């Protein structure tokens, strides 16, 4: 059924109205695409004041995300707003938060060339443009492996220069040679083509000096070419996509904010970290300062693609900055893009803590908590976002736990108790961990088991049916040797806990405690109740677990030799299979002679064995047609299996 034109227009108007776009962006201010759609709407209405305000808001939140600056600058350049462009360039290309991106620098070059017309400005204008090219070359182009377009533009500009006299001609030739010299010593795309272009140019310029100049540069070129091939392999899996302008921006080339619990693909993060590690090896044998500039450039490029990955920000901060003042500036920027990140929050709090700035430490934690609470309140009650809510509750609790411990360290127990007081008001927005953490904090710092026990008793009001909480409570009572309280907790909890995995652990814990510190009749009674609840559990498994010492099942180690799976695994493996059993079995198989190992379990899949069985024997081939090591490297580095892609 087709819709009428009126219906289509009404739907479009509804979907793209200013209010709808504003509400969409306000609901998720980390979604850059929502902001760009609103900017696109403003510009379609020639409402450039509002588009500028929104761009300014984005620059404030994401000052190191270069594509936003590039899109904004291009929009202003199209309308010849040179004063605005100049102010924007000063903001993004200088200062503590300077960007370093070739597309952004290319926009700067466009501005310089438009402002300095060679026809009207003559030699003075040319000098300004050449100075701008040199700046971009030193700041950015020598580090960028995809810089061939810049080098072509630079050389093209110099080749178009029509000298007025011999002195100018010689100056032009020297400049061209200097550019080639800089360019051919660094790894970048089309390096080989540029070398051929250079040798031809030298021969056309002066056949007498060509061999000398080419010879001087040859070794550096060969080294750069070799390193570029290596760099290609290192960066093969890296996806570098950025919008050319506002119209081409979409979800495929703009970073998307996703909660960590929904991040399934970390291949890009791993690929970028691999490139950074390779750069740090200094294959180009640069000076310490030059190496740092090059690695910093790659970090800033990684941020363009991994804006919402806290790890890349943390790595960058720890590499680039040696003092806490500089680190704080970048960590603040990182937290604006990742406002719920525990890693970045804790690191920034540390920077303030070493300066004994209690108020700044509190502000740091409170900002992260406020953002988590905002997200939690937005998502709470939506069944489709249940995994988000679980993550938000766990992260919120974790932040509060570290906040509480930090304030104890910084300002004493009363400050920590004040933080815990705030947590109690949040009730079900928190997990049980805050009560457990506070109980241990009270006990460790005051040796006060009464207050700690009261805290855990209070937690039962909210988590009385939480098997994990009951288990942790029992551990604490066991530590204090409060057997009677432990039994009371056990009896009042076993009917409330619905999670059978946790319930089984509660029973086993109580049986183990009675076995060590109680009496055997109580153990037998507990075992009877246990087997009524879990009739499929192997008798000897429970028996051997009961005789653990220092949490080590010696019966299995010394007598059962891991032939029986541990149904009541101490590590909480839902399968019940002892992971150490699996690990040792693999290790034992690897230590067997080849003949025995093949009989017990083939190392190769059946399909591979079938192929090997029909291949001709090696004695039929006099020469090697295939290098197996190269084939393995090729398969590892270049071939993606279907399962890996999914």
UniProtKB/Swiss-Prot annotation:
Segments annotated as HAT repeats: 46-78, 80-114, 128-160, 171-204, 249-281, 290-322
Gene3D superfamilies, per the entry: 1.25.40.1040, 6.10.250.1660
SUPFAM superfamilies listed in its UniProt record: TPR-like (SSF48452)
Keyword Nucleus on entry: yes
Any one of the GO CC terms: mitochondrion
Compartments it resides in: Nucleus; Cytoplasm
Primary location group: nucleus
Keywords recorded for this protein, A-Z: Cytoplasm, mRNA processing, Nucleus, Repeat
Function: Component of the cleavage factor IA (CFIA) complex, which is involved in the endonucleolytic cleavage during polyadenylation-dependent pre-mRNA 3'-end formation.
Protein name according to UniProt: mRNA 3'-end-processing protein RNA14
